[in-house]
Amino acid sequence: MNHHLHAVPSPFLSLEHVSRYRQTSRLPWQKTDPASAIFHDLSLNLQQHERVGLVGASGCGKSTLLKTLLALEAPESGAVYCDGNLIKPGSVRSLLWYRRRVQYIPQDPAGSLAPRQRVADLLIEPLKRLRPDEIRHANGHYSARLSEVMDQVGLSATLLDKVAGQLSGGQAQRVALARALIVRPEFLLADEPVSGLDLPLREQIKALLQQVTEQNKMGLLMVSHDISMLAGLCDRMLVMDGGRIIEDRPTTQVLASPQQAHTAHLLQAVPALSTSGY
């Protein structure tokens, strides 16, 4: 036996031979038409503390992949695993365990907040649902935890008494991130979380994601159609086209020497993109 061989770490999140198909009208006994596949027999491994970017043009399958990884939708074939455990989309017990470990930042984070609800209540809700023991131990005194998570996202605790509809766009984005962080997840899945923001705000949220993932030792999978939003944040980049992952390499290598024409096309959309600082 060679004692100098290094064991490959087990993935924290994985898709194994997953297939997803577009909804078509067919009878129950009819086989799925392979031509309707969004992606077919796709496998992907994500390590616990890595930051990964998933980029591709609209309609390439990015959002469907993310929904499958979130167990929001069951795959037609294949499976999703977290830390070696099979995630069952129809099982409340499985999903509660999974949501404690993996949290989601939606495409329109601000729009995910009920406008008439206080910020404090928006943050307490996932804590009650996913960490009830922590709520019981706090005996109703969880103001310290709320202040802590607000500080992590760069917001004053004075905003806790405001309703979400009173927040600015940037504040709402940060509250949505705080809502994901409050349950102390180990991994974040983000679906174009900065779409609709102006460039200065996008850069602020990008820097904040880097900061909180480093501080909390969390992994991140961030989906974007804009490759510039992943540069400087994600160490590994996946490029998706036509339901296939056509590149999976360190971000610096993808930016410096794209191996696929589709990747080069995505890079041409941001000609000022620089790889300096890596």
Indicate where each model-derived feature is located.
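ABC ATPase NBD coupling module
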Residues: 30-31, 87-103, 117, 121, ...
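Conserved ABC ATPase signature
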Residues: 163-167, 171
